[in-house]
Amino acid sequence: MIIDEFLARYLIKLRTGKFDVQMKLSRLLFSMLFSAVLFGCTDTGIKTNRKIQRIHNDLFTVDAHSASAINFLYKKNFDPARLNDFGSFDYPRMEQGGLDACFFAIFPGKNIKGESNIDITFKRIEKTVDAIANSIADNPDIVEAALHPDDGYRIVKEGRKAIYMGVESGFAINSVEMVKEYFDMGIRYMTLCLNINSLLCDSSTDPKGAEHNGVSQLGMDVIEEMNRLGMMVDVSNVSDKSFNDILEHSKAPVIVSHSACRALCSNHRNISDEMLLRLKGNGGVVNITLLSQLLKSPGIDNNSVQQKLSDLKEKYKDLIKADPARYGDEYNIERERIVKESGQNASVADLVDHIEHVIQVIGIDYVGISSDFDGGGGVDGCKDVTEIENITRELILRGYSRSEIKKIWGGNFMRVFREVAKVAERN
């Protein structure tokens, strides 16, 4: 039954020309042979699940972008060391799902320019970092803070989980000197903008359009400092012109911490095939994320769904500003309900479609995975961190080898992280 479902899925893709036929036929043959061994072991499927679990547990799995850091600061009852009945992440669920390393992308809050807001943003990030650090200090047998790419592998070998930190949005910074302050806090990547233009660069989604015609001079200086220190430059959310400027200026490979492929889902936040080719030339990595709106374009009921989502955003806009913890969760739950009822929610299969598209365009060495859990991330088959093994299962079903899955699940991301550190060492 499982093999029939797998074959049907692939025959559809081959007929529609969605993927390269020769490459897919070879993978299909491998998958049929692999599946025959894997699924022929037992009628109950117990051995099948054990084999997949063994492969999954053998990986070094990295979530390149988790928004769950917001819970450390805003959720009063959040204890990451215990199993919580809200959110998508905690340490017990991290263990259950087999996630080895997580990059907490610290969301700085309201995107408003100005000196006072930068000060507020800095303090908010500082408080979040302190909250995460305190949690790690309270649970040394479970987790450890990681700063260097090699730290993660060491920590996991010792039987614990590795916690890295990044900052989402260039609104966290208004001077080159601040880069060092964030680096000293333990921040190892920074996204240069979010949904509107920052002081550093233009966003892909600012309704006012471009402000800097790409990257500003301050943005260029910040990139140089990030390269010097060994902080990864995250080009998620940036405009196409900003993307090109960053790749031209950066001496180190860059990351796309959470995005997907524009060829499969038309969204300004996704990256085009041309951008993928430039990313390959830079040696960077794109991490395909579990955000339905980036993985799957709305269908026939597009206008109706989009109107409902637009109305919802307007309803919660001021409420979230006043109480991001309470109303942010309410908004995400309501948004997920609208998407689910519309039949537009993406699945693990959609996620892997985007991974395969990257592989087809630029090869298997430039793609990774991120969740954006507690920031809107979560698809059918992978709603929280306990279900990430389903991604491994889907990759196995599609014929990817253990070594290939290792690259996708963290190897490629850590390669870039290591190269960024080497560039800093040479400076």
Locate the predicted segments by residue:
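Distinct, well-ordered alpha-helical segments
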Residues: S175-V179, S239-A252
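Sec-dependent signal peptide recognition
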Residues: K24-S31
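Bacterial N-terminal signal peptides
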Residues: S31-V37
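N-terminal hydrophobic targeting/anchoring segments and the immediately downstream early-domain regions
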Residues: C41-N213, S266-N427
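Alpha-helix-loop-beta-strand connector modules within alpha/beta enzyme cores
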Residues: G214-M226, I246-P253
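Short Gly/Ser/Thr- and charged-rich N-terminal loops/segments
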Residues: R15-V21
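Substrate-binding cleft of carbohydrate-active enzyme catalytic domains
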Residues: D221-V235, K241-S242, M275-G281
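Histidine-centered catalytic micro-motifs
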Residues: T61-S68, V238, V256-A260
